[in-house]
Amino acid sequence: MSSSPHTHTLIIMERLSEVRLYSSPMTSVLNSNLSSCLTNAFIPDTVRMASSPLLAWMTLVVIGTLAPVSVFSCLSLKRSVKELLTERSSKLDVLDIFRFVAILWVMLNHTGSEGRIDILDRLPSADAFKSAMHDHPIFGALMGNSALGVEIFLVLSGLLAARSWLRKADEPFFQHWKSFIARRLLRLAPSMFIFVYIAAGPIMNALLPRYSSSMVSACGFWGILSHVTFTSNWQSTPTCMGYLWYLGLDMQLYMVAPIFLNLLHKFPKRGMALTITTIIASMVIRAGYCTAYGTCNQSDVDIPFISYPGQDAETLKSIYAGLWDMYSRPYTKCGPFLIGLLLGYITVSSKYIMVSTTSKTLFRSSLIVAIATIYAILPEYWNPNAGNTLYNTVYTAVFRSVFAMAISGMIAALYFRQEYRPTNPIFAMLAKLTYNAYLLHMPVVYIFNWLPFLQAATSPIHLLLVLPFVAILSFIAALIFYLFIEAPIGHLTSQYATRLGL
């Protein structure tokens, strides 16, 4: 009896996504010991040793603040505060609001997953909680589809990447590419490296042991290395600080973005054709993945990226099979980024001005499409065992890119409108803290494991009541991290980047 085409496709997709080699128990022990030794070589094993370099750095920041004419003056807290409070007064200020909404949505997503002990421990009550969230007539889809906050970030990232590249688009390609990537690395790497150092070591284990057990215990040396090399979205499973996968995706998309942007700048029609074709191809690949793995009824990928207790390799594989590949790889996730890239190109190349009525019409229609896309997941919640129906397959393939187009439409309506309306300065400040809030919000979410109100929650309303407290604590932590880590290091790296001609 011959195998079905579906079986062949599934086998091919499994082979492409992961090749598993047999290893003896002795080999596994040796690999574990090697990984442990390599990890300990870079991360101290006591809180005192791990905190010493951090305290030394903070001391230098304080010295730079108190002695403004010293060699450490570039680390000054006063300078960092001034930078944080500086207003840009640009038509792109509207992006700050979208960025803030996106991080709140991501926080909401994680509060409703990693914030719950029953989900972390895979207890029976976790399924009841998830059903209660999905079944809510108003907020069910908003909660279940909250991972769409990532698509907002991808649109913004693509838009800003395009504007950054096109400012010097006439420079020699490879010279410009190296400078473009170096600047992005200098933007993302320092804060992320220091956060991983704290999160993967004894400091976080002492403060939040449950975070360490579910987020870090499965890391080993290679898991940590994947984060500092921006390849964590290519891990076989997202069990090592899985929520940081976005940084790897962002860097990889930045690395290939100049190919599209160079073509858009020199041959606009060809560039448009290549970009649109790639977006469509990404949708087709998404449909292929969900069809092959039978996961088209799980479009929202509503599972936490953690290390579950007592799991073996096969259980782990079954939990994330297909979903992780579809959710994190550049070829399945590039659509929203490329849509933002096109919008960024249009904002640079076009001087078009919208009259007020056109701007309002575009914004409102785009908002309606965005809301409709969010709530179009409801048939999956109403029929959770429907499987790979045509509706589920098409929705899984296109909904992230359609949502990205709707977000881009709203941004375009605000950017090209005739009248300029400045946004509230508070959004500019919050937007500057968003990157650190993204890094730090997950440990904050774990603090709420001790909140009985959240653990007993049975409605999305309960999550919405907790969200402001998660956001406030996350942004307070982000402010401290910004003042002592991101801004001072940014001042140093910008000086060296200027000297190197980047």
From Swiss-Prot:
Task: Give one GO term, molecular function aspect.
Answer: acyltransferase activity, transferring groups other than amino-acyl groups
> Domain of life, per the record?
Eukaryota
Tissue specificity is: Expressed in intestine, some sensory neurons in the head, body wall muscles and socket cells.
A Gene Ontology CC term for this entry? perinuclear region of cytoplasm
Primary location: endoplasmic reticulum
Which segments cross the bilayer?
54-74, 92-112, 138-158, 188-208, 241-261, 272-292, 335-355, 367-387, 396-416, 437-457, 465-485
In its UniProt record, which GO terms are filed under biological process? negative regulation of cellular response to hypoxia; response to hypoxia
Tell me the compartments it is located in: Endoplasmic reticulum membrane
Bilayer topology reads:
Multi-pass membrane protein
Relate the protein's function as given in its record: Involved in the response to variation in environmental oxygen levels by inhibiting hif-1-mediated gene transcription in a vhl-1-independent manner. Plays a role in susceptibility to killing mediated by P.aeruginosa and by pore-forming toxins produced by B.thuringiensis. Probably by preventing hif-1 transcriptional activity, regulates behavioral responses, such as locomotion speed following acute reoxygenation. Plays a role in normal egg-laying probably by regulating spermatogenesis and in body morphogenesis.
According to UniProt, the name of this protein is Regulator of hypoxia-inducible factor 1
Q: Which organism is it from?
A: Caenorhabditis elegans
